[in-house]
């Protein structure tokens, strides 16, 4: 894989993680607006957000296996989210 392709895949992976974090923010916001929010579910989503943010902060352009895993795992999910 050439350097430009590595950076492209890295950027795609980071963006996918950010889309997922934003998606969980929306879910949390919607749940919090309910008359009786499910606090347990909110906490699960917050934990997931934290995990995704941590993955992003630790991700390196040279971590090609981690980048591939993120893109394979979150690619279909982020596409579905973006389609709404």
Task: Locate predicted features.
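Amphipathic alpha-helical coiled-coil segments
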Residues: 50-69
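N-terminal acidic leader/helix
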Residues: 2-35, 61, 78-81
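Amphipathic, hydrophobic secondary-structure cores in small proteins
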Residues: 35, 39-44
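Long amphipathic alpha-helical coiled-coil segments
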Residues: 64-82
């Amino acid at each position: 894989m050439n350097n430009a392709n590595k950076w492209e895949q890295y950027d795609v992976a980071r963006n996918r993680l950010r889309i997922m974090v934003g998606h969980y923010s929306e879910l949390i916001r919607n749940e919090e607006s309910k008359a009786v929010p499910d606090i347990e579910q909110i906490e699960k989503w917050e934990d997931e957000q934290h995990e995704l943010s941590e993955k992003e902060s630790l991700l390196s352009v040279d971590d090609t296996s981690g980048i591939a895993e993120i893109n394979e795992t979150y690619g279909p999910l982020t596409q579905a989210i973006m389609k709404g």
